[in-house]
Design a protein with these regions (language model features):
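Sec-dependent signal peptide recognition
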Residues: 1-6
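Non-catalytic structural scaffold of enzyme domains
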Residues: 16-419
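N-terminal signal peptide c-region/cleavage motif recognized by signal peptidases
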Residues: 10-12
Length: 419
């Protein structure tokens, strides 16, 4: 297995080591492992929930789309709404890696290998049964495994989608893996907007170049001309939306700063058409769409920027396209629940990561989160050490301003969280 893993992960030996580590502990009791015997039959697999993960609460925007999508007929599987949510019978397990967010900042400090390891660890958590209670001293093993993994994080998709797909292939398990970036590019194509394209994302996502590359490929394959594309990577906006104390200004203030930077980046393309399509290239950003849109309106009051920005912008949120892709993939693999079947869990489940405050060597900031210098100086390869633990997420654990955004803008998620 180790030789196979190294061949699959030629660019990341640490990802290969993690795949080998999980394979070496097939009972799923060890740290970063899962029960490899869980997927014994298609019938058993079909009754499993779907896993969704992000680096924090931003992926809840994707979960909202999954809970509310009505784009297919549930009986015929053909396109078209039928009045019933397309995933009404399915159940979801959501994981937000809150303790290690934002993922977009790791590449900027040369911690890409550690980021890739984190992303594969997220997948392993969803595949496994292992979790911690909020006050527990020992892990528990009653979380169900999943039949599909939705990477509801643009940075994680950019840096980890292929790693997870290769890992699933190496482990020989029938688990579907879907990411958000390709969906975002399809959203640009379907918008049919004529102006320029701006990508607002994290620093890490922008550094990867994945959106300009994927948008160009998608438009090109469809026989469409490719307009000017500019991008702006923010190290602050996702954290501000999360309510992280390290980012004390308002979400509106950070949104204005990033919108201005994107407009200036678009000016640099020297395109004749104004900036019209805004790709919300971080799953946190739909939670602040109103603030971002207002920021562009504010910028248009500046005569030097007015002609650079379209009066009416088109916002592309990759979440709905991701939900459509998951529906198609589950149907193709015959893993959608049948009309007379039920998932192995009755309700959706939510988890997030917190620092292990009792673990030797873990460094914390004054508010109890991981110390910033400690967080971004960690190295991969320590597969017997957990400085964070994954615990059930309840509404009271979400920062107040983030909870307000979820309650007001993601009603289906909020209802599920409060059951």
């Amino acid at each position: 297995m180790k030789i196979l893993a190294w061949l699959l992960f030629a660019t990341s030996t640490h990802a290969a080591d993690l795949v080998s580590h999980a394979s070496a502990h097939p009972d799923g009791r060890a740290v970063f492992s899962f029960d490899a015997s869980a997927w014994q039959s298609t019938d058993e697999t079909r009754r499993m929930p779907v896993g969704v993960f992000d680096s924090g609460i931003g992926g809840l925007t994707v979960l909202e789309s999954l809970l509310t999508l009505d784009a297919f007929h549930n009986d015929t599987l053909q396109p078209g709404a039928d009045g019933t949510p397309d995933f009404a019978q399915e159940r979801f397990i959501y994981f937000g890696d809150q303790a290690n967010m934002p993922y977009g900042n790791y590449p900027a400090v040369n911690r890409t290998d550690y980021l890739r390891e984190l992303i594969v660890k997220d997948a392993i958590f969803l595949l496994g049964r292992r979790f911690w209670s909020a006050e527990g001293k020992e892990p528990q093993f009653t979380k169900p495994p999943v039949k599909a993994i939705v990477i509801a994080c643009n940075t994680a998709t950019a840096y980890g989608l292929e790693d997870i797909r290769k890992a699933v292939a190496a482990w020989k398990i029938p688990v579907i893996v879907v990411g958000v970036v390709e969906a975002g590019a399809r959203g640009v194509l379907e918008s049919q907007a004529e102006g320029g394209i701006g990508v607002l994302a994290t620093s890490g996502t922008c550094a990867s170049g994945v959106y300009p590359r994927t948008i160009t490929q998608t438009l090109g394959l469809a026989g469409k001309s490719v307009p000017a594309i500019a991008q702006q990577g923010s190290p602050t906006l996702a954290g501000a939306i999360e309510g992280d104390s390290a980012f004390p200004e308002s979400v509106s203030a950070y949104a204005l700063k990033e919108a201005r930077a994107l407009a200036e980046a678009y000016r640099g393309t020297k395109a004749a058409a104004p900036l019209q399509t805004i790709v919300l290239g971080c799953t946190h950003y739909p939670l602040a769409k109103n603030e971002i849109d207002a920021a562009f309106d504010e910028l248009r009051k500046d005569a030097a920027l007015r002609d650079l920005i379209a009066e009416k912008r088109v916002f592309v949120n990759p979440a709905e396209a991701t939900a459509r892709e998951l529906f198609r993939e589950l149907a193709k693999a015959k893993l959608r629940l049948k009309a007379d079947e039920h998932c192995s869990i009755e309700q959706h489940q939510f988890y997030f990561s917190v620092p292990r405050v009792d673990e030797t060597g873990v460094q914390l900031s004054a508010d109890g989160s991981l110390d910033k210098d400690y967080k971004y100086s960690r190295a991969p390869g320590h597969l017997d050490f957990e400085d964070t633990k994954n615990v059930p997420l309840t509404p009271d654990l979400i920062p107040a301003n983030s909870a307000k955004l979820v309650r007001e803008r993601l009603p289906a998620v909020w209802k599920s969280l409060n059951r």
